Structures are given as structure tokens and as C-alpha cells.
Amino acid sequence: MKFVDEAVIRVEAGDGGSGCVSFRREKYIPDGGPDGGDGGDGGSVYLEADENFNTLIEYRFERFHMAERGENGRGRDCTGHSGKDLILKVPVGTRAIDHDTEEVLGDLTTHGQKLLVAKGGFHGLGNTRFKSSTNRAPRQKTLGTPGEVRSLKLELLLLADVGLLGMPNAGKSTFIRAVSRATPKVADYPFTTLVPNLGVVNPRPGQSYVIADIPGLIEGAAEGAGLGIRFLKHLERCRILLHIIDIEPIDGTDPVDSARAIVGELEKYSPKLASKPRWLVFNKADLLLEDELKEKAERVVKELGWEGEVYTISAYGRDGTKELAAKLWDFIQSLPPEDKDANPEDEVEFKWDNYHQANIDAINEDYDDDFDDDFDDDDYDVEVIYQR
């Protein structure tokens, strides 16, 4: 199935049902009074993370999603049915963003997690609610409020512990094949990898973590060169980045310039991502003699002013890959646990929360101000004819 990691959809929660104006009409019961019921609440729209989904392609072609409207109230104090909630299944790792305000509504990072993205309208009140000592036959009701409408931008961010960075043909896909059972396409031309790939690494029995390989970056990617930087977002949740450097490029380019270009594009995209722990990994060590390899690696480290971890491997020959995979596991385990700030029932702010109380208070205030002793002449009263 085609990998789609972005989609824009429109969600509409259901409107609340309106209240009913009705009076009790029953034999032998004079002056039955009001019996209009309330309407039902409108259905809300939720996103739910499902591990059985791995792409947003369904929402690329189906963009409009509406929850059910609440039913209107009826006589005999019958309340209308509430509208059914609409639950949209999305892959684990999906982020919901308000397309108009760019507000991040939430991240769905665990299976079964739900996020409320559009709240259904509040139900209207029937005339029974407005009965009082000064208004015995009310003909007032309130309408249901509109459901919330949002344009959502859905972004799928891969959940991985380790992310791979590097120029095209640096050997990232070969490395992920060497340390996991993933089988991304490998060839001797640039941009072989067109979509992100995930692999599960098992460095020792009972140990595992996930590694993500994204398409290669080139200088100017922030301006749209190559495949751009749109896939860098998949590294945002990684706990450590591996910067794969081709120590002996076939086109004769300087590894120092290539490394600086990658760091520059990373900083342009996100300073936060650029500040993540990052290790330098010199690949294709099998193409050079040991002394020449050491000399080149030391020159790159010196010119970059690099003070972090440095490793030399041959992904093709799998030299040093097993040791690197084990050290990555040890490093990940040494990090503090990630903050779990996502609330499975996270709700968005809704403007109608105090709607009913405000309406009732306002109407009762009007009656208290205008009430006089002559009930029949009250401005708010109505003529009611009861039949026996």
C-alpha cells in the first residue's frame, strides 16, 4: 500500500437537538402544565490510534467526516436521542494539528488512545425547564448549539528509537539491513530510498529497539532540493540520531562538506531535532586501508570540531555493525524515561460549556424584572386554553 504520511480533513461534530414546546393534555387533568423535553447532544468526533494501520492514504481521498446530529425533544418530557460519536481510526504515531491555527491538538502514540477533535453541540432545553412561579405556562425553549467544525492536518510520525541521517548513497539502507531484518531497496544510485523504512534490532537476546531510515538529504533540501526535508519529521520522536558518512564517496566529494551540509539542513528544519544526541558513523571502511581510513576519519572529526561519539563500520561487510547495535541499546537504556504527557481522553476547549445556565439565568431575570401581580397581563405570559 502506498505510504502517505500527511492528509488534511474536515471534521464536523453533530449539532445539538432543539428543545420542545409542549403542554400536557390529558383527561381529568386540568392545567396540565408544560411537558416539552430537551433535545439530544450532538455526536463528537474522535481520533483513535490503531496499530493495524500504517498509512493515512484513506484520508487522502475521503476528506469530509460528520458525526450524527442530536434529535429534537418531544412532548411528554421525552428527551431526544444523542447523536452517535464518530471515531476515525489512524495509525499509531499520528499527530493532529488544527489546519487554521496551527495548534497541535495532540499526539496518538499508543494503541487504543483516543483524542477528541470536535465536540458535539449541546442539547437545547424544553419549555419544562422554564416553568417557575411567575411563568406557569412557558413557551420558551432553546435551540441546540452547533457542533464544532475543524479542518485537521494529520501527520504520521514514525515511532523509532534510532534515526539515520546522511547523504544519498551513504549506506543507510545497507546499515539497516545489516542490523535488522528490514529489507529496504539497495542500489548504487542516489535516492534509492523514497519512503521511510523501519527495522527492529535485536542486539542481544531479550533486547530490541526500532531504527528508522529516511531518504537521503542534500544541500538545499530546506528549499526543496532533492526530496526536501519533509521526511525529517519522522526523526522527531527518535532518542538518538546516527549520522552516516560515506568515508570514500564515489563522486569524489569531501566528507567534511557533506557532513556540514547535513547538519545545516537539520538546524534549518528544527533546532530541537538538531540538539538530539547524535553519533558520527563512518561507513564503507572496507574501501580503504587501515592507515588511510584512520587518517581520513581523524581529519573529518578535526575539521568538524566533533567531540561526540565516533564509530567506523562497513555496513556491506557487516564489520562493526553488531558492536554498534549493542552500544546503541546500552545508550538508550541509560536515558531517562520519556515523559508520557499524552492524555488518552484529551479534550479540546469548547465554547458552549456554560450555554444552558446562561440562558436560564437570563430568562428568569427577565421574568423577575417584569413580573407584576396581574399574571394574565404579564408580557411573557401566553393564552393557554385547556380542554377537558
UniProtKB/Swiss-Prot annotation:
HAMAP family reported for this sequence: GTPase_Obg
InterPro entries, per the entry: G_OBG, GTP-bd, GTP-bd_Obg/CgtA, GTP1-OBG_CS, GTP1_OBG_dom, GTP1_OBG_dom_sf, OBG_GTPase, P-loop_NTPase
Question: EC number(s) on record?
Answer: 3.6.5.-
Q: Which Pfam families match?
A: GTP1_OBG, MMR_HSR1
List residues of the OBG-type G domain: 160-333
Record: residues binding GTP: 166-173, 191-195, 213-216, 283-286, 314-316
Please give the function described in this protein's UniProt entry.
An essential GTPase which binds GTP, GDP and possibly (p)ppGpp with moderate affinity, with high nucleotide exchange rates and a fairly low GTP hydrolysis rate. Plays a role in control of the cell cycle, stress response, ribosome biogenesis and in those bacteria that undergo differentiation, in morphogenesis control.
Q: Would you say which domain of life the source belongs to?
A: Bacteria
Is RNA-binding one of the keywords UniProt gives this record? Answer: no
Cellular component GO terms, alphabetically?
cytoplasm
Q: What class of enzyme is it?
A: hydrolase
What protein does this entry describe?
GTPase Obg
